[in-house]
Amino acid sequence: MSIALFPGSFDPLTNGHLDIIERASLMFDKVVVGVGYNTGKKALFTPEEKLALISEVVSDLPNVEVAIMHGLTVQFMAEIGARFIVRGLRNSKDFEYERDIAGVNSALADVETILLLAKPENQNISSSMVKEIGSMGADNMAKFVPKVVVDALKERLN
């Protein structure tokens, strides 16, 4: 069984993230969306809130699971039996970063990094941008995030 991990902070999940999840679900027997967190960063949503939001959004994808990650990515991959890491690339800056991380991960464990190019309509979407425009009261957030996330953002930011 081919198992892939799609890790991220997902604060919040964007349509770009969702596109990568959907495409990865067609490539692997199982995809685990790994909700990571950085205790040094102030997140808008808790890991548990992100897990609930993402689980609702991907509920129609039978081979996709959502879990909160602990420890190193490669350690979490061993726990879930994943050999592949899926990452999305929006631009060359993302590529440089992901290439370096892929090298470290492959040095630590027998893992392969699969890089998927963002679709043109998602290349400018980032969680930071979504939070910024959401905090300014933008009404058309559905262009950037799934509806359940729009509702959660409106509740959290207003």
From Swiss-Prot:
GO BP terms: namely: coenzyme A biosynthetic process
> What Gene Ontology cellular component terms go with this record?
cytoplasm
- The EC number(s) given in the record are 2.7.7.3
Asked if the Swiss-Prot or TrEMBL record annotates the protein with the keyword Repeat, the reply is: no
Residue positions annotated to bind substrate are 9, 41, 73, 87
Query: Could you state a single Gene Ontology molecular function term?
Result: pantetheine-phosphate adenylyltransferase activity
Q: Keywords assigned by UniProt?
A: ATP-binding, Coenzyme A biosynthesis, Cytoplasm, Magnesium, Nucleotide-binding, Nucleotidyltransferase, Transferase
* Residues binding ATP, per UniProt: 9-10, 17, 88-90, 98, 122-128
Q: Quick one: where is this thing mainly located?
A: cytoplasm
The cellular location(s) given in this protein's UniProt record come to:
Cytoplasm
Its pathway is:
Cofactor biosynthesis; coenzyme A biosynthesis; CoA from (R)-pantothenate: step 4/5
Q: Which domain of life is it from?
A: Bacteria
Substrates-to-products reaction catalysed? (R)-4'-phosphopantetheine + ATP + H(+) = 3'-dephospho-CoA + diphosphate
Q: Where is this site: Transition state stabilizer?
A: 17
- Cofactor dependency: Mg(2+)
What HAMAP family does this protein's entry cite?
PPAT_bact
Q: What's its job?
A: Reversibly transfers an adenylyl group from ATP to 4'-phosphopantetheine, yielding dephospho-CoA (dPCoA) and pyrophosphate.
Homology family? Belongs to the bacterial CoaD family.
Description of how the protein assembles with itself and partners = Homohexamer.
Q: Which protein is depicted?
A: Phosphopantetheine adenylyltransferase
